[in-house]
């Protein structure tokens, strides 16, 4: 009887852990399908080389979907000029910030997808500044509200650079 109860408990625990496993980057299945379709179209535009080799590596569902989103909508030059590992590093860095900051889980999925995950907004050079800035800022903002964290980042920026008109 004790063994049956123990075995049942282990099975329940395994089922629970399996259910709590990897999460989706995009929870809306229809939107996820649209991104997948757009990603496949992008792949057909660039069939030569190993530009999409990162997708042949071991990725979580979240990482795969986030990368597919980025690749589907990023400029072709960013796919050709930057490695998949670079883009994966940025996916992981953005998720780390969302997971570690107290307000990170409250950022709406579409806002995160379009304004946090992308490595750039316009045509600036891509680099690993996101990782460097996070290391420098996380302890300054981790106990603050989202609004106060935004203000603190502005203060930090003022400490680092001063605008001088040209």
Regions found by a protein language model. Give the residues of each.
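Secondary-structure boundary elements
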Residues: 80, 84-166
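Intrinsically disordered, low-complexity N-terminal segments that are enriched in acidic
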Residues: 20-98
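Bacterial N-terminal signal peptides
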Residues: 8-17
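Generic signature of intrinsically disordered, low-complexity, basic-rich segments
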Residues: 1, 14-15, 62, 125, ...
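Positively charged, low-complexity intrinsically disordered regions
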Residues: 3-4, 33, 96, 131
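Short intrinsically disordered, low-complexity coil segments enriched in acidic
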Residues: 2-3, 19, 163
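Bacterial N-terminal signal peptides that target proteins for export
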Residues: 1-9
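Residue-level detector of intrinsically disordered, flexible termini
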Residues: 17-18, 148
């Amino acid at each position: 009887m004790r063994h049956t109860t123990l075995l049942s408990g282990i099975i329940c625990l395994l089922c629970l852990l399996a259910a709590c496993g990897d999460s989706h980057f995009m929870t809306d299945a229809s939107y996820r399908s649209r991104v997948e379709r757009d990603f496949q179209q992008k792949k057909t535009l660039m069939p030569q080389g190993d530009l999409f080799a990162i997708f042949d590596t071991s990725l979580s569902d979240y990482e795969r979907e986030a990368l597919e989103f980025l690749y589907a909508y990023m400029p072709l030059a960013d796919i050709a000029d930057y490695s998949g590992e670079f883009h994966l590093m940025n996916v992981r860095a953005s998720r780390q910030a969302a997971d570690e900051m107290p307000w990170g889980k409250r950022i709406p999925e579409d806002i995160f997808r379009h304004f946090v995950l992308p490595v750039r907004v316009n045509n600036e050079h891509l680099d690993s500044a996101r990782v460097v800035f996070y290391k420098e800022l996380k302890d300054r903002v981790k106990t603050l509200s989202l609004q106060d964290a935004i203000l603190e980042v502005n203060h930090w920026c003022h400490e680092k650079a001063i605008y001088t008109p040209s």
